[in-house]
Amino acid sequence: SVSNNLNDISKTHPHLLRKVADQWYGTHPYSDWIIKHAYRTLLKKGDKQALSLFGYENADLIQLHDLTCQSSRIAIGESLEFSFYIHSDRDQKVRIEYAIDFVKARGQRHQKVFKITETNIRKNETKPYTRIQSFKDLTTRKHYKGIHTLSVIINGEVKDSLDFQVC
């Protein structure tokens, strides 16, 4: 699709996607969807220009509280449940993601970012979030023992992190 091709181009030539976005974004809801989908890699990387285009400002006035995991140790094949709260000191559009630094076969680590939601938060509002991440081996992902890191990202900024053991 067009958005997939633009996303691929953005990985090596992000300025070209920005040119297309300048021409297409805001002209029609369909083209807006294409541009947003094309920007998915840059959004996951926390690219400030990409976040700004879609109305995500810096997250200085957003606090993350009580990031906890139900267990600090999980076995391969189990799931990690984690939760947290966010609170804002102003009305703001937020993109909430989490990243896991997975241990790979030779001990190196690879980060994968997962989107939780895109929403609005009101001034003085507190919102709870709970997610479950499976550590079951898949054909596309094999899990390895070791210390992994969970990070919560709001509008491209890591707000809190914690380590957990996969055994």
Placement of each model-derived feature along the sequence:
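Alpha-helical scaffold domains
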Residues: S1-V166
